């Protein structure tokens, strides 16, 4: 190989690396940075909602500020195992389903499960407490409406869903790959206890911060091992090691709460 050809390849590699870095650094989770969360709305015209939107997520969820609504009922979901890929966006690790991974029904509208994002620490807080991890299951209806189901985690036993994906997640930190085929992935492995949950209207938690998102946040906390969270953190860039957006104002929004009532057994 001639020296000029080698130089050309080095320049191309440098340019490619620079482009990838720029994509990853479009926004940061580090408060005080020029591209930090308080400035997202000023970085691009199409991200203006991040700064000016009135229904932004995440928010603080407090039991003493909710509207109890028993008509919500248990979640009507029907998930199925299907081929999926893992993608490293630089800001988070996500699972993207290639086929029909099943659906969630809200107000008689079917929302197809599309992808799952992971954020550590959690983005939502519950009664003043922030948790070690949050999984966000993004769903989409035929008319492009979106609904997100959120699971909060504390350190404890390993999460079975992430356990099946650990070997794939490791590859992100040991190679330059940003997309990996994960084979068949079963969303039913997720620890979803829908006997109690919060619901409110909000937004996506990363630019462009699109509003009109129906959020359902599980009240019961699941468990994840510290090692599993570490693997997720090692995969992303340094601006997203703690990839949780700061809490946003509730702005007079209603937060509804469902809890399944325990049946009472009467002695005769």
UniProtKB/Swiss-Prot annotation:
- The name of this protein is Dioscorin DB3S
The record ties this protein, via PANTHER family, to: CARBONIC ANHYDRASE, OS08G0470200 PROTEIN
User: What modifications does the entry list under PTM / processing?
Assistant: Not glycosylated.
Where on the tree of life does the source sit, at the highest rank? Answer: Eukaryota
Annotated catalysed reactions? hydrogencarbonate + H(+) = CO2 + H2O; 2 monodehydro-L-ascorbate radical + NADH + H(+) = 2 L-ascorbate + NAD(+)
CDD domains named in the record: alpha_CA_prokaryotic_like
Q: Which residues cross the membrane?
A: none
Q: How does it assemble?
A: Monomer. Homodimer.
Instruction: Return the EC number.
Output: 1.6.5.4, 4.2.1.1
The family database entries (SMART domains) matched by this protein are listed as: Carb_anhydrase
Residue ranges occupied by any Alpha-carbonic anhydrase domain in the UniProt entry:
25-259
Starting at the broadest rank, the lineage of the source organism is: Eukaryota, Viridiplantae, Streptophyta, Embryophyta, Tracheophyta
Extract one GO molecular function annotation from the record. Answer: antioxidant activity
Give the protein family. Belongs to the alpha-class carbonic anhydrase family.
Question: What is the originating organism of this protein?
Answer: Dioscorea polystachya
UniProt keyword list: Allergen, Antioxidant, Disulfide bond, Lyase, Oxidoreductase, Signal, Storage protein
Give each disulfide bond as a residue pair. Answer: 50-209
| Gene coding for it | DB3S
């Amino acid at each position: 190989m001639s020296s000029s050809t080698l130089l050309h390849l080095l320049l191309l590699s440098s340019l490619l690396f620079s482009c990838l870095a720029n994509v990853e650094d479009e926004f940061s989770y580090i408060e005080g940075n020029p591209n930090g969360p308080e400035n997202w709305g000023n970085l691009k015209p199409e991200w203006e909602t991040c700064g000016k939107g009135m229904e932004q997520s995440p928010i603080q969820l407090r039991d003493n500020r909710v509207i109890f609504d028993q008509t919500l009922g248990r979640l009507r979901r029907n998930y199925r195992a299907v081929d999926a890929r893992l993608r490293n966006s630089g800001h988070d690790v996500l699972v993207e389903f290639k086929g029909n991974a099943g659906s969630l029904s809200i107000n008689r509208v079917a929302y197809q499960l599309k992808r799952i994002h992971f954020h550590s620490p959690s983005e939502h807080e519950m009664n003043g407490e922030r948790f070690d991890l949050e999984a966000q299951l993004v769903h989409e209806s035929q008319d492009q409406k979106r609904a997100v189901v959120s699971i909060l985690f504390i350190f404890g036993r390993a999460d079975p869903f992430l356990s099946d994906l650990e070997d794939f997640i490791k590859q992100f930190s040991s190679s330059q790959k940003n997309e990996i085929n994960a084979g068949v992935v079963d969303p039913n492995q997720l620890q979803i206890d829908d006997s109690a949950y919060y619901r409110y209207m909000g937004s996506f938690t990363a630019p462009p911060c699109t509003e009109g998102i129906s959020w359902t946040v599980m009240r019961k906390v699941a468990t994840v091992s510290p090692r599993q969270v570490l693997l997720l953190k090692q995969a992303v860039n340094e601006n997203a090691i703690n990839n949780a957006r700061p809490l946003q104002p509730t702005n007079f929004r209603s937060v509804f709460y469902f809890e399944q009532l325990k049946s009472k057994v009467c002695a005769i």
